[in-house]
From Swiss-Prot:
Gene Ontology cellular-component terms listed: cytosolic large ribosomal subunit
Family: Belongs to the universal ribosomal protein uL30 family.
Domain of life from the UniProt record: Bacteria
InterPro entries the UniProt entry points to: Ribo_uL30_ferredoxin-like_sf (IPR036919), Ribosomal_uL30_bac-type (IPR005996), Ribosomal_uL30_CS (IPR018038), Ribosomal_uL30_ferredoxin-like (IPR016082)
GO biological-process terms attached to the record: translation
Keywords: Ribonucleoprotein, Ribosomal protein
Protein name: Large ribosomal subunit protein uL30
Pfam families found in the cross-reference section: Ribosomal_L30
A molecular function GO annotation: structural constituent of ribosome
Assembly information from the UniProt record: Part of the 50S ribosomal subunit.
Originating species: Leptospira borgpetersenii serovar Hardjo-bovis (strain JB197)
């Protein structure tokens, strides 16, 4: 499995509740915060739903 680093680049203020909950599930609570995750189909779906709020890099 490949690892990726997910960084929150935009605030969650004013976004849909579902997007805030997705960010929280990814472990992102503040702008600039980073988390390392293993790639999976479930994770890919979560990343696609909040792609306008995050940046994804290979680890």
């Amino acid at each position: 499995m490949e690892n990726i680093i997910v960084t929150q680049v935009k605030s969650s203020i004013g976004v849909k509740k579902e997007h805030r909950l997705t960010l929280h599930a990814l472990g992102l609570r503040k702008t600039g915060q980073q988390r390392k995750h293993k790639v999976s189909p479930e994770l890919q779906g979560m990343l696609d739903s909040v792609r306008h709020l995050i940046k994804v890099e290979k680890a």
